[in-house]
Amino acid sequence: VALINNQFLPYPYYAKPGAVRSPAQILQWQVLPNTVSARSCQAQPTTMARHPHPHLSFMAIPPKKNQDKTDIPSINTIATAESTITPTTEVIVNTVATQEASSEVIESAPEAKTDQVTSTVV
């Protein structure tokens, strides 16, 4: 394992050797045919191009971030929400017109009856 120190890397990388191919398997420069359209004024020379996916003989692997740290157990800091019963007071007004059994016309205002009801809403 080789240590790679580079001024552009924020922390050092360790290089692990990968699968190494024999020289016969490594692709060399290959000659590509001229693919320029016929509209070109000048004849283009044959171009040399490298294989688009060169094989790397090693992989750069970043070091583990928690190498020197001890294991810290994870603690759930989010408290579970418990439902709290909050009593609410609602005022219900019943307006009832009471009629007597007599034949007289009652011109008084209807009676107002106020009941206070307490309900629990969850």
Curated annotation (Swiss-Prot):
GO terms for biological process: lactation; protein stabilization. Kappa-casein stabilizes micelle formation, preventing casein precipitation in milk. PANTHER family: KAPPA CASEIN, KAPPA-CASEIN. Glycans are attached at T84, T86, T89, T95, S102, T118. Its main location: secreted. Transmembrane segments: none annotated. This is Kappa-casein. The modification Phosphoserine is found at S102, S119. It is found in: Secreted. It comes from Rucervus duvaucelii (Swamp deer). Belongs to the kappa-casein family. The modification Phosphothreonine is found at T98. Keywords: Glycoprotein, Milk protein, Phosphoprotein, Secreted. Mammary gland specific. Secreted in milk. The keyword Glycoprotein applies. GO terms for cellular component: extracellular space. Residues 102-122 are annotated as: Disordered. The lineage of its organism: Eukaryota, Metazoa, Chordata, Craniata, Vertebrata. The gene is CSN3. The record marks F58, M59 as: Cleavage.
